[in-house]
């Protein structure tokens, strides 16, 4: 090793030394240039000792030497690791320490030779310190470096310079790009302030004082921003913060970049607490109180990496699953097209067998009824005049009777809730699709109306008017001795006008029930906007009372049927109508008494939390929902909300997000009676009435509650493993599940026990859940306040780690993006020193950007082999196709089964 050091020093100082021993020749491989030049230059040399080969690139100046790059290379000369740009020095971890030790000796030799001529300059000392930092990088931190500080992300960078050049041509003015448009040009939309700071830094480094860029200058900027070397990216980031270019970051400069990063990521609370976080960074990186930090200090903090144990576990899981998936995929590729389509068909039946048999039965009944009535009228005398028009009209009428009766059953909420909670019928009937089935039946009604009314109005009546006297003779028992004089005679008759009115009312209700109108998605300029929305949907849907009344009349006054037992409309409708009316009466009596308000909180993101006393005899399951009516807002409207409390809690709670007129007015009414929170409380406004202060209670409006009602999420009890995914306010039913699991853990000391006595009087069932993964994705940092108490409770009481919480803030750019680099650093530092997350304010660490859902499923699959996992999602529909597909893929390609359930949100 002494020969290695001596050879290196000699190469750095003596250009003329060309004779070496054979041993030295084996150690020093010819370099790329003169290491002893008086001018500044970059030189490269390769060294070999035993089986290790390393290439070192030096930045040589008159009085200092700095390592530019350190790379491990193989015998053929190709590199298998780097040092300067953050890659591992050698691939095998066992060699890392030995090689690092040798490199340190080389560095020390260089410093000693340089100092023999002159005392070490501050620059040389900083270089040596930087070298030691780089040589100490672990393999995991090098991996972090590869991903870190990306100024141009893969989403933008994959398009390359061509895309940037195209945007330049679109945004340029007189051949130059304005400073204010720099961010948009390089793909940093929405981060204009951050992009301007980048512009200023790059321009300052090049001595550019103008506020515009030419295309060549922009390309130069772009090449620096897309440099793949971590140290170069670190220098770019450091220069952006170091505005006076003195090589040091003061507390004020650190504060500015914290505020800038917080603004770019829409994190207002971090921006407000910039002073506090600046002090935290300076305390960590400047322990001697020099008043500044240097680049190598910042680098050390940026390169913090996850624990090696976790990394090894993840790697093992990933490789294990990848092998299984590869084998499965390989077998799929060898399939013939016929076998492939057959397999896809079988997969479809496996996933949708409940829906399939119900839909098959429904369609079969409709077809059978149509054919039965069609054949019946095909053999009657009226067929001789009206032909296939009357058979079509009567066949469609029979399906209409059936569907008008059936369409009421999916909305009998109390009946469905009782059946799914008390019986095993839910094992074969897809109760979760009740609303979807209601819509399908409504579509069947629309088809039946079109065929029935269309055939009568356009074919049957005209044919009867133009029938010969001989043909009409057979119709006299039905239409009278005198032939109808005109078309109007049919329309103004009882059968005619009742049918026309029903068609008009159903058309109105059907149109305003469409999502586009029900959710009021019309533009403000559209004159129909005031006529749409939930209220329009709710009131027009209640026109069914008139429709069913007219249907009874229409089905009684028939032209071609005189005997009562042949008028079958009432037979179809009797039971469903009685059942539905009974439900409405039950709801009326059950929701008569108001609930007591115990606590109110108004949170960021326009969320109102209401904590109420339980109505007498009120029992529910986690995942269910209730209807709420506030008479101060509207005396008629009921709105559904998921229950966020657990069955074992002594209160009933809901979290309501403002989305329309009714919820906006409700929030306003309760906000007026609240106060600002005291220290230690969350929310914007609060009111705690649990101590029974009657004068304060009187200020709150009266609330009526109806429910509970069954929902897909209540089926979580069927699974040992849960994957709960909530998007925004969609986390509400899942929070109740998390609290219920926690209550079982707290009450019994472990899972696998029976459910609380208060939740049901039925026979107790074992509590199945052994593991729960909860992923909550939200755009706003303030959203974490909604359920801060629950997260703290889980952290404190779940000692066995049954519940795994993952919070994701999607407004923050993904880890590795330069815009979020400082936020990630702050989070790691805050969590390490204080155990508190900077966004949620709890011990639950927040992740940035959206989750990689494939990786999430991968983790669960390898952790729970040969088990059924219940995947429960509640949120906007945008994520449903992806999660459904992933559930199917991992079910088919691993030995873990994923059952996907979606809330009707």
From Swiss-Prot:
TM region positions: 356-376, 441-461, 497-517, 540-560, 569-586, 718-738
Keywords of the record: Calcium, FAD, Flavoprotein, Membrane, Metal-binding, NADP, Oxidoreductase, Peroxidase, Repeat, Transmembrane, Transmembrane helix
Impact reported for residue 273 to N: Reduced RAC1-binding
Compartment(s): Membrane
Xref: Gene3D superfamilies: EF-hand (1.10.238.10), Nucleotide-binding domain of ferredoxin-NADP reductase (FNR) module (3.40.50.80), Translation factors (2.40.30.10)
Source organism, top-level taxon: Eukaryota
Region (EF-hand-like 2): 206-217
Gene Ontology CC terms, in alphabetical order: plasma membrane
Quaternary assembly: Monomer and homodimer, stabilized by swapping the EF-hand motifs. Interacts with GTP-bound RAC1.
Name listed for the protein in its UniProt record: Respiratory burst oxidase homolog protein B
Biological source species: Oryza sativa subsp. japonica (Rice)
């Amino acid at each position: 090793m002494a020969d290695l050091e001596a050879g290196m020093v000699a190469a750095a100082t003596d250009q003329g030394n060309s004779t070496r021993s054979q041993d030295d020749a084996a150690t020093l491989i010819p370099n790329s240039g003169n290491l002893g030049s008086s001018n500044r230059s970059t030189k490269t040399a390769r060294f070999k000792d035993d089986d290790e080969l390393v290439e070192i690139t030096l930045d040589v100046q008159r009085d200092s030497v700095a390592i530019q790059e350190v790379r491990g290379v193989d015998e053929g000369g190709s590199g298998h690791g780097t040092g300067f740009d953050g890659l591992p020095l050698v691939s095998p971890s066992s060699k890392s320490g030995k090689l690092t030790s040798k490199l340190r000796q080389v560095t020390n030799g260089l410093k000693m030779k340089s100092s023999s001529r002159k005392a070490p300059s501050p620059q040389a000392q900083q270089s040596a310190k930087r070298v030691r930092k780089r040589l100490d990088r672990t393999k995991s931190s090098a991996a972090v470096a590869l991903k870190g500080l990306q100024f141009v992300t893969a989403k933008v960078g994959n398009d390359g310079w061509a895309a940037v050049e195209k945007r330049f041509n679109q945004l340029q003015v007189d051949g130059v790009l304005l400073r204010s448009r720099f961010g948009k040009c390089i793909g940093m939309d929405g981060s204009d302030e951050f992009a301007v700071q980048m512009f200023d830094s790059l321009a300052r480094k090049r001595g550019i004082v103008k506020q515009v860029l030419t295309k060549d200058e922009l390309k130069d900027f772009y090449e620096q921003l897309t440099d793949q070397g971590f140290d170069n990216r670190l220098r770019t980031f450091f220069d952006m913060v170091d505005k006076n270019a003195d090589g040091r970051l003061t507390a004020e400069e650190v504060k500015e970049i914290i505020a800038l990063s917080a603004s770019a990521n829409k994190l207002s609370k971090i921006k407000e607490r910039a002073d506090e976080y600046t002090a935290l960074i300076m305390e960590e990186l400047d322990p001697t109180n020099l008043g500044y930090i240097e680049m190598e200090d910042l680098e050390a903090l940026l390169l913090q990496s996850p624990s090696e144990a976790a990394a090894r576990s993840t790697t093992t899981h990933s490789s294990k699953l990848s092998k299984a998936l590869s084998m499965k995929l390989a077998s799929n590729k060898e399939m013939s097209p016929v076998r492939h389509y057959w397999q896809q068909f079988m997969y479809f039946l496996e996933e949708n067998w409940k829906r399939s048999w119900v839909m098959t039965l429904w369609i079969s009944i409709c077809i059978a009824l149509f054919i039965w009535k069609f054949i019946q009228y095909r053999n009657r005398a009226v067929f001789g005049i009206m032909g296939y028009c009357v058979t079509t009209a009567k066949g469609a009428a029979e399906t209409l009777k059936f569907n008008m009766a059936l369409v009421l059953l999916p909305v009998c909420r109390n009946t469905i809730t009782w059946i799914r909670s008390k019986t095993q019928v839910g094992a074969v009937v897809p109760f979760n699709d009740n609303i979807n089935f209601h819509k399908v039946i409504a579509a069947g009604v629309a088809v039946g109306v079109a065929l029935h009314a269309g055939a009568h109005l356009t074919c049957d009546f005209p044919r009867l008017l133009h029938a010969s006297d001989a043909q009409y003779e057979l119709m006299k028992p039905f239409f009278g001795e005198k032939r109808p004089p005109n078309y109007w005679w049919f329309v103004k008759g009882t059968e005619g006008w009742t049918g026309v009115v029903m068609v008009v009312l159903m058309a109105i209700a059907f149109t305003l029930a469409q999502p586009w109108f029900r959710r009021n998605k019309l533009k403000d300029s559209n004159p129909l906007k005031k006529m749409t929305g939930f209220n329009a949907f709710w009131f027009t849907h209640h026109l069914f009372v008139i429709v069913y009344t007219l249907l009874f009349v229409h089905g009684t006054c028939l032209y071609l049927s005189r005997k009562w037992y042949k008028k079958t409309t009432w037979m179809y409708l009797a039971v469903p109508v009685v059942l539905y009316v009974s439900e409405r009466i039950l709801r009326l009596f059950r929701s008569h008494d108001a609930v007591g308000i115990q606590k109110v909180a108004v949170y960021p993101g326009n969320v109102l939390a209401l904590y109420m006393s339980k109505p007498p005899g009120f029992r529910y399951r986690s995942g269910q929902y209730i209807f709420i009516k506030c008479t101060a807002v509207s005396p008629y409207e009921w709105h559904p909300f998921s229950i966020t409390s657990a069955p074992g809690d002594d209160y009933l709670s809901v979290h309501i997000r403002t989305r329309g007129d009714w919820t906006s007015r409700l929030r306003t009414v309760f906000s007026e009676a609240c106060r600002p929170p005291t220290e230690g409380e969350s929310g914007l406004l609060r009111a705690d009435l649990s101590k029974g202060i009657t004068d304060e209670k009187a200020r709150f409006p009266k609330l009526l509650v109806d429910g509970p009602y069954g929902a897909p999420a209540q089926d979580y009890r069927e699974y040992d493993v849960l994957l709960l995914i909530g998007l925004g306010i969609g986390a509400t039913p899942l929070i109740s599940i998390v609290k219920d699991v926690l209550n079982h853990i707290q009450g019994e000391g472990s899972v696998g026990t029976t459910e609380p006595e208060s939740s049901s009087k039925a026979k107790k069932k074992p509590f199945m859940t052994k593991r729960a993964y909860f992923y909550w994705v939200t755009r706003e940092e303030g959203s974490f306040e909604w359920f801060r108490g629950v997260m703290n409770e889980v952290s404190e009481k779940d000692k066995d780690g049954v519940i795994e919480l993952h919070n994701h803030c999607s407004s923050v750019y993904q880890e590795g993006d330069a815009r979020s680099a400082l936020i990630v650093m702050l989070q790691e530092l805050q969590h390490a020193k204080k155990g508190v997350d900077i966004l949620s304010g709890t011990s639950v660490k927040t992740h940035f950007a959206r989750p990689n859902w494939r990786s999430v499923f991968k983790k669960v699959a390898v952790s729970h082999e040969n088990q059924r996992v219940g995947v429960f999602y509640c949120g906007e529909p945008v994520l449903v196709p992806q999660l459904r597909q992933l559930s199917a893929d991992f079910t088919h390609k691993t030995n873990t089964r994923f059952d996907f359930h979606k809330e009707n949100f």
